[in-house]
């Protein structure tokens, strides 16, 4: 099996530091890292919205963590990564183009939770991205898959919506703009 062992160069788009706008909880962030760091302290999320990834990470190290952070951080990362690829179809296609390669967030800064350093680590970011890639692949083939409507190019409303549509402020999924959850956040 092929392996992608660093999210740099050709594969920089896989990194949370990659500059790609993402809507999360009704707020537009410049990158996934800013959205993730903001989720640590929900009352201060807007402070992170315009920050670069390095600045967001620095600020995220100084905030008081929400009490349930250790139990919710993996689900939050999953939601934010899904939002990134559903809201940026060009990146979704690039993720699909990685084929069946194992995605490893290799690093030298010692992150053994989200990545792998010196051959050791849990690689949660890589695992999340591979799951999203599998869902994207399934959605292209299976009209019964819940993601088919969003990524496969068909929308039940018949409105002609395509990936890259209006992000729902409540759940970060995409809709044609008629989503009741989306409309309730305006």
Q: What positions do the PLM features span?
A:
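Charged, low-complexity intrinsically disordered segments
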Residues: 1-186
